[in-house]
Amino acid sequence: MQNWLASVAVVILTSVGIPTTSWALEFTADRVTHTDRGFHHARIFYHDGMWRLEHNERGPVSVTIVRADRNEVWHLLPVTHHYKTVLYHPDYALHLATTLDDEISRERIGVQTLDGHPTVLYEVLTVSPGGGRASYYQWIATDINFPLKLAKKDGDWMVEYRHVKLGPVSDVFFELPRHYAPMDGDQ
């Protein structure tokens, strides 16, 4: 009986717009980016403002850990067991919202299936503080409410998330390994 009452209370509260709980976004995925320098593949682990990218390029594996909460980014070099610390910059930010910064219009273009997820494709127009405009295509997965793909309309760049798994990600992924030493010049 108590479970039934609790369920009814949650339904009533959410239907009138009162949040009952806020959940942090946590997921793992394969991330593919395309720029004028080619395609880049990485495995991403994300937990509420912290993320780890394990780059899958030719040569030695490298890892980037972004800690926006600490205003730091660590570039790990597993071959030498060293790391380099740099300051966090907004350029490191991921495009994980279902709306874009400085968005001024959004038009539904159609529906598609990406990586097994039903998506709605939008054309989005943004304006920069200087007045410049940019157009994007954004694919939002409707089953998991997640932006699977974002591409600049002119083809300049694209980011896509594949094999997205929503769920808890251990904090261990976002800490420096104990046996790593700072590179010369780092503290």
Predicted feature locations:
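Generic structural motif
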Residues: 29, 104-107, 119
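An acidic-aromatic
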Residues: 40-96, 152-163
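N-terminal leader/targeting segments and the immediate start of mature chains
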Residues: 1, 5-51, 80-81, 168-172, ...
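Gly/Pro-enriched, hydrophobic low-complexity segments
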Residues: 57, 62, 115-180
